Design a protein with these regions (language model features):
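Short amphipathic, basic-aromatic surface patches that mediate peripheral association
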Residues: 34-45
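Bacterial N-terminal signal peptides that target proteins for export
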Residues: 2-18
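Glycine-rich, aromatic-bearing surface loops/beta-hairpins
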Residues: 113, 119-123, 128-167
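Beta-strand signatures of extracellular beta-sandwich domains
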Residues: 52-56, 67, 125-127
């Protein structure tokens, strides 16, 4: 008996893939917007500060790193809340690092965040540390809501004010 290879319709899986991609692209979860975070540092009289800005969900679970200011990895452990929470995130530093921020200077970074995260109990946190000075875990905690956009939050030690803007 001569068996022929069975002919398959290759367009069916392709159509399913395209339909799924379109559904995700047009779902509310797929829409995102730039969020600009600005942190104005105090004139605290020390070396440049290391800062870690990261996102927490409504249950207090780490979601992702938004930015890390300060390039020497050996000092990242001083950003203690972020360091502990993000330890399992292999991508935590991919494309989100820059120089430390000097006393009296401003850090301004932009990250894309899904619209579904806004007004859903999420929070932006910033840890801060400076050489030979106290570490300041969760220096600033800002609820990610439309009502808090543009409202300055005061830091505990190094940050004069921190705000975020929704674009």
């Amino acid at each position: 008996m001569n068996k022929r290879p069975r002919k398959t319709n290759m367009s069916q899986p392709l159509l399913t893939l395209v339909a799924t991609a379109c559904a995700l692209a047009f779902s509310p979860l797929a829409h995102s917007r730039p969020v600009t975070l600005t942190a104005q540092l105090k004139n605290y009289g020390g070396d440049g500060a290391y800062l870690a800005a990261y996102l927490m969900d409504a249950k207090g679970v780490y979601v992702r790193t938004l930015w890390v200011a300060g390039g020497k990895a050996k000092y990242h452990k001083h950003l203690s809340d972020w360091y502990k929470l993000s330890a399992g995130d292999a991508k935590r530093l991919n494309g989100v690092t820059g120089a430390s921020v000097g006393a009296g200077r401003t850090l301004k970074v932009t990250a894309d965040l899904a619209d579904a995260l806004i007004d859903a109990g999420y929070e932006i946190r910033i840890d801060a540390a400076a050489e030979d000075m106290r570490d300041s875990p969760s220096e600033v905690r800002i609820p990610l809501s439309k009502a808090n956009a543009g409202k300055p939050q005061t830091g505990k030690q190094y940050i004069q004010s921190a705000t975020f803007q929704l674009q």
